[in-house]
From Swiss-Prot:
This is Phosphoheptose isomerase. Zn(2+) binds at H58, Q62, Q172, H180. Its EC number is 5.3.1.28. Keywords: Carbohydrate metabolism, Cytoplasm, Isomerase, Metal-binding, Zinc.
Length: 196
């Protein structure tokens, strides 16, 4: 058992090192997309399922409250947060529509969609991206494996941050580091703290 625990840490570290070497430019580009969105008076909309739903909510909480330094609240909406809306849409239509209907109601040109799916194949996230595309909302997709269906939906103005792993747990661990890196880019760009 102890050996397996050690192996988990080793594999996580190796995946994070590989991701840091591969994903830096994409993370930086995504962070600056978010900065421009916020400077334009727009909002970041996030969605995902399971652990990715938790990441989507966590990211929005970091923007609405703070990341590591005191600053004004920033506009962000997690489409996972309103259980009444999610269950209403799932019951009256289908679960595939729980995010796309919200985007059609809440999303506007100038916003950014942060779509999180470890497999890249989550149907409701795919439909969210399709709704965002129809509203000219740029997409930042956090994926893993081969990028799945999501990878094929992204256009020139979108960014895919694909973790180089085929293991969901490792992908989710790197996604959290990516999200914290995005928070740091936003905070240090919008609210520079001097030499710190």
């Amino acid at each position: 058992m102890l050996e397996q625990i050690k192996n988990n840490f080793t594999e996580s570290i190796q995946t994070q090192i590989a991701a840091s070497e591969l994903l830096g430019p994409s993370i930086e580009h995504a962070g600056m997309m978010m900065v421009q969105c916020l400077l334009g008076g727009n909002k970041i909309i996030s969605c995902g399922n399971g652990g990715s739903a938790g990441h989507a909510q966590h990211f929005c909480a970091q923007l609405l409250n703070k990341y590591e330094t005191e600053r004004p609240s920033l506009p962000a909406i997690s489409l996972n947060s309103d259980i009444s809306t999610i269950t209403s849409i799932a019951n009256d239509y289908q679960y595939d529509e729980v995010f796309s209907k919200q985007i059609r109601a809440l999303g506007h040109n100038g916003d950014v969609l942060l779509a999180i799916s470890t497999s890249g194949n989550s149907r409701n996230v795919v439909k969210a991206i399709e709704s965002a595309v129809s509203r000219d909302i740029p997409i930042i997709a956090l994926t893993g494996f081969d990028g799945g269906d999501i990878s094929g939906l992204l256009g020139e103005g979108d960014v895919e941050i694909r973790v180089p792993s085929a293991r969901t747990s490792r992908i989710q661990e790197v996604h959290l580091v990516v999200l914290h890196s995005l928070c740091e880019i936003i905070d240090t760009t919008l609210f520079p703290q001097g030499d710190s």
